[in-house]
């Protein structure tokens, strides 16, 4: 997937190589889901390695909280104040970051929503499971990161509420117990994931 859909710069893992990126690029873009969540903060995503004279932009960045803990506010001010532009995917996040940095932080769409329906359909047709698993009858598609009882209970409630019996489950961790009649996917790529959602 990554090789097909992205054009990557050479991998930079040591501080010296990361520092050299400043000579190779004149603009740096960061963003997306929870990159600035204070409970899992890594200043790398605040582009701490980028020199002051370089242009830094954050698109659809996310903090996923309604306030930044006081003991971390100086970190946010230090690194985000030098950004040329900050766009956040959450309205609350935009307000919090504006107040901290003194910058105008606009709220924008999640990048997933920037493509139209036809583009997503074309994308999904690249999957390995397309046409191998029928999607012509109604189904509930579940994506589980863990294996928690409340998720399975919620699934049963949804099945009853909508009268849909077919369930397709993709789980990162193998479920501890498999419910008879459900379809379990052990390997689905990103294209397949989108295929099941459309």
State each model region's role.
Residues 1-78, 125-126:
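Aromatic- and Gly/Pro-rich donor/ligand-binding loops
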Residues 77-81, 197:
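A conserved, positively charged/aromatic
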Residues 26-27, 55-57, 85, 110, ...:
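Structural motif
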Residues 83-90:
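A short beta-strand/loop micro-motif in the catalytic core of glycosyltransferases
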Residues 105, 109-113, 117, 172-198:
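Donor nucleotide-activated moiety binding/catalytic core segment of transferases
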């Amino acid at each position: 997937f990554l090789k097909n859909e992205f054009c990557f710069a050479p991998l930079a893992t040591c501080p010296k190589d990361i520092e050299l990126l400043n000579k190779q690029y004149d603009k740096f873009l960061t963003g997306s889901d929870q990159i600035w969540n204070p409970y899992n903060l890594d200043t790398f995503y605040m582009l701490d390695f980028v020199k002051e004279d370089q242009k830094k932009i954050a698109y659809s960045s996310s903090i996923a909280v309604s306030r930044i803990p006081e003991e971390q506010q100086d970190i946010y001010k230090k690194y985000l104040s030098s950004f040329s532009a900050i766009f956040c995917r959450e309205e609350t996040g935009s307000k919090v970051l504006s107040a901290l940095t003194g910058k105008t932080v606009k709220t924008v769409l999640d990048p997933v929503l920037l493509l139209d329906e036809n583009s997503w359909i074309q994308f999904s047709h690249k999957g390995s499971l397309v046409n191998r698993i029928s999607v012509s009858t109604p189904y509930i598609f579940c994506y589980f990161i863990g294996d928690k009882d409340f998720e399975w209970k919620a699934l049963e409630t949804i099945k009853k509420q909508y009268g849909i019996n077919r369930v397709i489950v993709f789980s990162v961790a193998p479920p501890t117990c498999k419910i008879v009649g459900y379809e379990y996917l052990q390997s689905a790529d990103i294209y397949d994931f989108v295929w099941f959602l459309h």
